[in-house]
Amino acid sequence: MAEFFPEIPKIQFEGKESTNPLAFRFYDPNEVIDGKPLKDHLKFSVAFWHTFVNEGRDPFGDPTAERPWNRFSDPMDKAFARVDALFEFCEKLNIEYFCFHDRDIAPEGKTLRETNKILDKVVERIKERMKDSNVKLLWGTANLFSHPRYMHGAATTCSADVFAYAAAQVKKALEITKELGGEGYVFWGGREGYETLLNTDLGLELENLARFLRMAVEYAKKIGFTGQFLIEPKPKEPTKHQYDFDVATAYAFLKNHGLDEYFKFNIEANHATLAGHTFQHELRMARILGKLGSIDANQGDLLLGWDTDQFPTNIYDTTLAMYEVIKAGGFTKGGLNFDAKVRRASYKVEDLFIGHIAGMDTFALGFKIAYKLAKDGVFDKFIEEKYRSFKEGIGKEIVEGKTDFEKLEEYIIDKEDIELPSGKQEYLESLLNSYIVKTIAELR
């Protein structure tokens, strides 16, 4: 089979001093940390949509990307070419997972029946390529936002016919995700929300969204799909207000409808930015709720108000993100999916590789720093000391539910001064810097 990327070699680890843009500086997939290869800690994944479908189009300009599969004019030939290119791409980068929307991998037909038949043909091609590869499916999902039929939403639409279409589309997406051995299935509600409350039945939409998710849970059980269901929060874009605004909002919704036991969260860095949170905040919220499932790895631009989906190169963000993953016990049915696209002006094929290499190196380095932070317990020790008052005396009684307002008033009413510990934020931020510098210095 002819190569799609003949000019790109298999990417090797060359160490931190390397200046080769097509080499890893910090990511050695077989490096063993805490008894496990680095690749199994990180579980990198390629996003089919950004890497093989995005062509550099934006609202102000035409496509710019030079892609080898664009030489195919027939939609099916192009779909098969993209699949073949995916496996070559993953193997050259030593990435073992990929993710997709149903409409990324196959074109739509005139009816859903025809579309499903087309999809089946592409799935067969993927299965054929999987036989000779170690590349696996991390998670699948359905695109319920691009087609005009979803202008009012999918599960939250005003049209029962559209609701039925969306349900049938998710049914098929679940089937092919199971068929391909996917570890999870993602629900992202890009059109599940509203532009104005003047024309919105908020109660009905939220109830229908719960009904939709409950049907998905029931069908997954029926077909024996044991992958992890994941909600991907995002506050806005393309819809003005989306119902899965952030982890806290989405968790409250799931809890309210008795669905929380079936779902975890797929946290995207840029979505946290849009919600006014840090990436770590969303990961921490998911972790303390026991709902940290997977990550869409990217970064946003704080000076822009939209989802820029840039490759992650901020070492502070990746360090603190991996710190939360480590504290959560690591990934099980999840991983680091690069929901990131090269910039429109980075239009060469090699830029696809360079972008992924940059992200993989940054997360690998972040993991190594985070591992040292977690192992040394530097933040844990400080936090434990800061909240020490709740480990003894009246504080312990508060935590154990052995006191009340009257007793607390009696305890405090004659105290003159309360001595508080210092937050020492500046010291802790400086300590984080020290760990970053020290870890890099110790690397070969």
Swiss-Prot record:
Residue sites binding Mg(2+) 1 per the record: 232, 268, 296, 339
Main localization, broad class: cytoplasm
Keywords: Carbohydrate metabolism, Cytoplasm, Isomerase, Magnesium, Metal-binding, Xylose metabolism
Enzyme nomenclature, EC number: 5.3.1.5
Gene Ontology biological-process annotations: D-xylose catabolic process
Residues binding Mg(2+) 2, per UniProt: 268, 271, 307, 309
Catalytic residue positions: 101, 104
Keyword field contains Metal-binding: yes
InterPro entries linked: Xyl_isomerase-like_sf (IPR036237), Xyl_isomerase-like_TIM-brl (IPR013022), Xylose_isom_bac (IPR013452), Xylose_isomerase (IPR001998)
Cofactor(s) named in the record: Mg(2+)
Cofactor note: Binds 2 magnesium ions per subunit.
Gene3D superfamilies for the chain: Divalent-metal-dependent TIM barrel enzymes (3.20.20.150)
Transmembrane intervals: none
Any one GO molecular-function label of the UniProt entry: magnesium ion binding
NCBIfam families: PRK05474.1, xylose_isom_A
Family in the record: Belongs to the xylose isomerase family.
PANTHER family: PTHR48408, XYLOSE ISOMERASE
Subunit structure of this chain's protein: Homotetramer.
Protein name, per record: Xylose isomerase
Organism (species): Thermotoga maritima (strain ATCC 43589 / DSM 3109 / JCM 10099 / NBRC 100826 / MSB8)
Lineage start: Bacteria, Thermotogati, Thermotogota, Thermotogae, Thermotogales
